[in-house]
């Protein structure tokens, strides 16, 4: 008798066919990778196919693969990753679609399929700059209105570009260039034989 994960894998391959870029199993979960051009249609199939029935989107996030594998990775930089649940069949799936353009990452919005994707996609847009085409209200959700850049990108400086402070003369919050100097954080190594200045 086939296990649940084997059954799901067979159902996915049968329903999606050539649209599957890769389908891998790790830690008891399947990860399905599809092209950005197929992302929306695949999501509809995952929800509507009677042998799949992924009724619920649990989570959606962006990922920046710029330094993945110690920089050895040379594939697309940004991906949208969705975690889906089939309440009917009691199985889960991770769906990943890589944006083909690193300079302007665009993937389709899943809001029309799972309304719970709304704020998740806004968050991924705000933090990674991934544009979700067809989203009804794609604007920042976590950072300030005038924020420049996308803070979860690997090339975004830890200290940021601007800082805000209250100006008592203007009686309002103002933005100014960051006054913190960027620095390399190196962990402190404690040698046991000289710990605390004591010689053992």
From Swiss-Prot:
Single GO MF annotation: quinone binding
UniProt topology in membrane: Peripheral membrane protein
Domain of life of the organism encoding this protein: Bacteria
Localization, UniProt: Cell inner membrane
Keywords recorded for this protein, A-Z: Cell inner membrane, Cell membrane, Membrane, NAD, Quinone, Translocase, Transport, Ubiquinone
This enzyme's EC code(s): 7.1.1.-
Cross-referenced InterPro entries: NADH_DH_suC, NADH_quin_OxRdtase_su_C/D-like, NADH_UbQ_OxRdtase_30kDa_su, NADH_UbQ_OxRdtase_CS
GO terms for cellular component: plasma membrane
Catalytic activity entry: a quinone + NADH + 5 H(+)(in) = a quinol + NAD(+) + 4 H(+)(out)
Main function: NDH-1 shuttles electrons from NADH, via FMN and iron-sulfur (Fe-S) centers, to quinones in the respiratory chain. The immediate electron acceptor for the enzyme in this species is believed to be ubiquinone. Couples the redox reaction to proton translocation (for every two electrons transferred, four hydrogen ions are translocated across the cytoplasmic membrane), and thus conserves the redox energy in a proton gradient.
Quaternary structure annotation from Swiss-Prot or TrEMBL: NDH-1 is composed of 14 different subunits. Subunits NuoB, C, D, E, F, and G constitute the peripheral sector of the complex.
Family: Belongs to the complex I 30 kDa subunit family.
Protein name: NADH-quinone oxidoreductase subunit C
Organism: Burkholderia cenocepacia (strain HI2424)
């Amino acid at each position: 008798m086939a296990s649940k994960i084997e059954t799901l894998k067979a159902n996915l391959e049968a329903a999606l066919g050539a649209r599957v870029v890769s389908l891998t199993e790790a830690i008891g979960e399947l990860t399905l990778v599809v092209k950005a051009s197929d992302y929306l249609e695949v999501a509809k199939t995952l929800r509507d196919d009677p042998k799949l029935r992924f009724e619920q989107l649990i989570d959606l996030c962006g990922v920046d693969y710029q330094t993945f594998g110690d920089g050895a990775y040379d594939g697309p930089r940004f991906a949208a990753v969705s975690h889906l649940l089939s309440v009917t069949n009691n199985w889960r799936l991770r769906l990943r679609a890589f944006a083909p353009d690193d300079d302007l990452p665009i993937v389709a919005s899943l809001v029309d399929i799972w309304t719970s994707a709304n704020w998740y996609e806004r968050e991924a847009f705000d933090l990674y700059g991934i544009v979700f085409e067809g989203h009804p209200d794609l604007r920042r959700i976590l950072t300030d209105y005038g924020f420049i850049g996308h803070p979860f990108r690997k090339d975004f400086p830890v200290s940021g570009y601007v800082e805000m402070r209250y100006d008592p003369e203007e009686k309002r919050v103002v933005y100014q260039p960051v006054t913190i100097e960027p620095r390399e954080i190196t962990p402190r190594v404690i040698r046991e034989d000289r710990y605390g200045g004591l010689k053992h």
